[in-house]
Amino acid sequence: MGTVKRLLAAAGFVACGQMGLMAQASARITLGLSDWPGWVAWYVAQHNGYLKKYGAHVRLVWFPSYMTSVEALSAGRIDANCQALIDTIAPIVRKVPIKVILVTDNSAGNDALMVNNTIHSFAGLKGKSIAVEMNSIEEYLDVTALHEHHMGVSDVHFVNMSTGNSAAALITGRVAAAGVWNPWIQRIEARRAGHPLFTSAQAPGLIPDLVVARAAVVAAHKKDFVGLAKAWFATVRFIKAHPRQAARIMAPHVDLTPAVYAESLSGTRLFGAHMNRVAMNPGGSPASLYNSTIQTTRFLRQVKMVNATPSPRAFIDAGIVNQAAR
């Protein structure tokens, strides 16, 4: 799931701002989400009544543009948001008062470096152009892939484009490769325009996706957030037990068929209670945010997005997950 900077920003901001105001009128907490499979899963929680069952007074607020949701949380226009770790660290370094309270998933194949059908190795990628949104998760994955194959950024030519435009550039042959996430991976494959050379399945723990909330709201509505976590754990159990039924609930929200959307789910490792405790607490697992924060911040410092490494203890609130998992 890469950063979608300002796709439909003006329209998306106005629409989502209006939805946010309506949500605040009828719920204690507004939770922003966008089209990543691990976040569309919240509609399963809503559909199945888990939010109500576990006492989470939460209204889901849909954002057509992912980065608009990140900006809305930082500005305090929503109470909580579904966003990636890589897009959470910079606001934390800027002292935005937010806390990570839940891990929804890790990308496990839903982010990929896609290449045209003439390229079958990293050696074949040398000297070629890669369309990718710079300073995003997709660039992070691409740079990681290059390094793992003994190549560097100087061995390729990065072309800065939004993720949708990156996919279009590969499909039309304007570039040899593109850093994208689903559903763009599926759209490239459906047009037989390319295949994955490297995916997030080959980099466990590299791309954690989170629920991040305003610190003051967490303090004021802890019971609601505990209920939210319980609802999430129930959602994960349901999706794992009934993937086809879950896909039927989720697919209409992203304008895909259930069959196609089921493939997206397979590339997302949803985190239930056990994996949340692993991720939200210190430990040796690649899934621990204490480890991925260091790795992710190293990349962000290299591209000059941040100038400091935040302490995970300062922004990870494991109390919500630990209480919900009892």
Task: Map each language-model feature to its residues.
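Bacterial N-terminal signal peptides that target proteins for export
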Residues: 1-9
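Bacterial N-terminal signal peptides
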Residues: 9-18
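Short, glycine-/small- and polar/acidic-enriched structural segments
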Residues: 24-166, 172, 176-182, 197-199, ...
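Secondary-structure end/capping motifs
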Residues: 220-305
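Conserved C-terminal helix/tail region of periplasmic/extracytoplasmic solute-binding proteins
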Residues: 294-326
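Pocket-lining segment of extracytoplasmic ligand-binding domains
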Residues: 86-87, 158-159, 165-259
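Phosphate-coordinating loops and pocket residues in cytosolic domains that bind phosphorylated ligands
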Residues: 127, 190, 317
